[in-house]
Swiss-Prot record:
Keyword Transcription regulation among UniProt keywords: no
Origin: domain of life: Bacteria
Alphabetical UniProt keywords: Cell membrane, Membrane, Transmembrane, Transmembrane helix
Protein name: Uncharacterized protein aq_453
Length: 257
């Protein structure tokens, strides 16, 4: 019972902190940065996939489609068109894409340092320029592996659907855990795991709610639904970044309680 009380107390305090210190500002900044960097990041990944065979952009697209709300897939499809440019991109455009991508990771680190305050990890500049591509390659590898594992689970364990859903979610869990581990001083691994799974759970719930809403809007008016899709997509991204920052604050609150 003491552990549950500790968890609920940390959860309440991190939500209160998010309201007091207006984490929505940093979530909005991260949303804007991501929109600016998505196309360059995909161009860089497309070029990287030509050298590393296990990087499959099609699998990444499947993961995105599965975890993004329905009716926003058209936005993803437009963004993913940038992958065609990556196959013929010049060295200069690749360097520019890489520069923008690294700056986005720096922005994540800066936002997390604001949220976790005393538990921020001092990261050397070299980490951003060298560690980022390594993280990107690992994320692509985990994406490919989780995709094939989810297919196997669907084939041999048809009655246990949550196993395949969990397997397909591994890339996102891996990414959240990796970012927290890279920029936050973790004293107890249990706090990292609890926080990451809470972020995943509420992100999944958020996706479900947004999917229901977009389906409802499209039923009422296709024109209105089409016009509101992009706005909903931005809003959904913003809420997910807010969850990510609250999850980081949860780690500090849980370990200090």
């Amino acid at each position: 019972m003491g552990t549950l009380r500790k968890l609920l107390n940390a959860l309440f305090l991190c939500l209160w902190d998010a309201f007091r210190y207006d984490y929505s500002y940093h979530a909005s900044a991260l949303t804007l940065q991501l929109l600016l960097v998505l196309a360059p990041l995909i161009v860089f990944l497309a070029a990287l996939s030509s050298y590393l065979g296990f990087i499959k952009l099609d699998l990444l697209e499947e993961v995105l489609r599965e975890h993004f709300p329905k009716q926003t897939h058209a936005v993803i499809a437009e963004i993913l068109k940038a992958k065609e440019q990556g196959k013929t991109a010049s060295l200069i455009s690749l360097l520019v894409s890489y520069f923008f991508s690294v700056n986005f990771v720096k922005k994540i680190a800066k936002s997390l340092s604001y949220v976790v305050e005393r538990k921020k990890r001092d990261v050397h500049e070299v980490f951003f320029w060298v560690g980022f591509p390594i993280l990107l390659v690992l994320f692509s590898f985990v994406t490919g592996m989780s995709f094939y594992v989810s297919i196997l689970l669907k084939t041999y364990f048809k009655g246990i659907g949550f196993l395949s859903n969990l397997a397909s979610s591994l890339p996102l869990l891996f990414l959240v855990i990796s970012l927290y581990w890279s920029f936050i001083k973790i004293n107890r691994k249990i706090s990292l795991l609890i926080s990451s799974f809470l972020v995943y759970f509420f992100a999944s719930l958020l996706q479900y709610i947004f999917t229901l809403y977009t389906v409802y809007v499209f039923k009422g008016s296709v024109l209105y639904g089409s016009l509101s899709t992009i706005v909903l997509f931005f809003l959904w991204l913003n809420f997910n970044f807010l969850l990510f920052l609250v999850g980081a604050r949860f780690i500090e609150r849980y370990e200090s309680s």
